[in-house]
Amino acid sequence: MRSQPHVLGIVLAGGEGKRLYPLTADRAKPAVPFGGAYRLIDFVLSNLVNAGYLRLCVLTQYKSHSLDRHISQTWRLSGFAGEYITPVPAQQRLGPRWYTGSADAILQSLNLVYDEDPEYIVVFGADHVYRMDPEQMVQHHIESGAGVTVAGIRVPRSEAFAFGCIDSDESGRIVQFLEKPAHPPGTPDDPNMTFASMGNYVFTTKVLVDAIRADSENSDSDHDMGGDIIPALVEAGEASVYDFKDNVVPGATDRDRGYWRDVGTLDAFYDAHMDLVSVHPIFNLYNRRWPIRGETENLAPAKFVQGGLAQESVVGAGCILSAATVRNSVLSSNVMVDSGATVEGSVLMPGVRIGKGAVVRRAILDKNVVVGDGEIIGVDLERDKQRFAVSNGGVVAIGKGVWI
């Protein structure tokens, strides 16, 4: 039996998420609720824990209270075997300053690396929706002999300009790392596809520490993992690509195998929710062999009374639909939809209240939003733009705790 290497996980969770405003007005992007029972960070933590990586540092900064509380309440490990998932806010160990970039966040947290003394470090982002077995990527990294391995997902070349792109040779060595290029490179085996960076990296520890320290002395650097550290290691010939399509997750269906979504905009966030609601969803939340763990509350089951109806929808615990209709929507816990109301193609976060006869279409309602009797949202976008945020795709977004 192959012995397991000593691996430390670092999750970069300090993102502000400006493009998700107003959902990030009061919380860090990784703390944004998703899918009726989760927060965005639950996907990366579930992937790491399912793979057996149980020593994880979550680097936080921007409005981190919700995130810190969620980790402490939802992600408690036994600790008997040195297991931990711990949020790490900026410690100001190098002076009176906060993190200036993702690489600087790791620089300021190198004491954690020295304490753990791992052979390898996985550095993953905290705000994507996907399933992945990181252990397979770690083994690929070890076998490649590279200093860093970058996870790449194949996207159509015509769409790749929106991503950090990887140009690699047939051996998997990265020859260029390009940030949102006008002319993305093809993959070695398909000129019509491009490797887009998933923001997930595996490092040999010494390579990461040396690169982080060298970057800290460069006054021209933005101290960013994708923008500075990876390009420097590519130039040094130390980087390889890991093809995400080779990652085999137990229980994955043909339909959702290889699913990965960057939900950094309101439209992308909305579209990812719509991926969940069909009979055969593009992303299956119900894979018991690779579960996504989320908040567990002591709530009663959802209830449908007086003809309340939900079609093609995800409905969380504690919801009550009373003579109301919900279609193609995702309802988080404790949502109440009153008589005669209609909710279509919408995302309702915990504690939302929809009044009698109200209509909500193509909208995202943050926690504890109250929609009054007879209110109409998502039908007249010109009117909605005067009151709320409306995305380029016409999705109405209403911030936390708003009464309408």
From Swiss-Prot:
A molecular-function term among this protein's GO annotations: ATP binding
Keyword Transferase: yes
Binding positions (alpha-D-glucose 1-phosphate): 99, 164, 179-180, 197
CDD domains: ADP_Glucose_PP, LbH_G1P_AT_C
InterPro entries reported for this sequence: ADP-Glc_PPase (IPR011831), ADP_Glu_pyroP_CS (IPR005836), GlgC_bac (IPR023049), GlmU/GlgC-like_hexapep (IPR056818), NTP_transferase_dom (IPR005835), Nucleotide-diphossugar_trans (IPR029044), Trimer_LpxA-like_sf (IPR011004)
One Pfam entry name: Hexapep_GlmU
Enzyme Commission number, as recorded: 2.7.7.27
Catalysed reactions listed for this entry: alpha-D-glucose 1-phosphate + ATP + H(+) = ADP-alpha-D-glucose + diphosphate
Tagged with keyword ATP-binding: yes
SUPFAM superfamilies tied to this protein: Nucleotide-diphospho-sugar transferases, Trimeric LpxA-like enzymes
Coiled-coil zones: none
BP term (GO), one: glycogen biosynthetic process
Signal peptide (UniProt feature, chain positions): none
Pathway(s) this gene product operates in, as recorded in its UniProt entry: Glycan biosynthesis; glycogen biosynthesis
EC category: transferase
Record key words, sorted: ATP-binding, Carbohydrate metabolism, Glycogen biosynthesis, Glycogen metabolism, Nucleotide-binding, Nucleotidyltransferase, Transferase
HAMAP family in the record: GlgC (MF_00624)
Family named by the database record: Belongs to the bacterial/plant glucose-1-phosphate adenylyltransferase family.
Function: Involved in the biosynthesis of ADP-glucose, a building block required for the elongation reactions to produce glycogen. Catalyzes the reaction between ATP and alpha-D-glucose 1-phosphate (G1P) to produce pyrophosphate and ADP-Glc.
Assembly description: Homotetramer.
Name of the protein in question: Glucose-1-phosphate adenylyltransferase
Gene that this polypeptide is encoded by: glgC
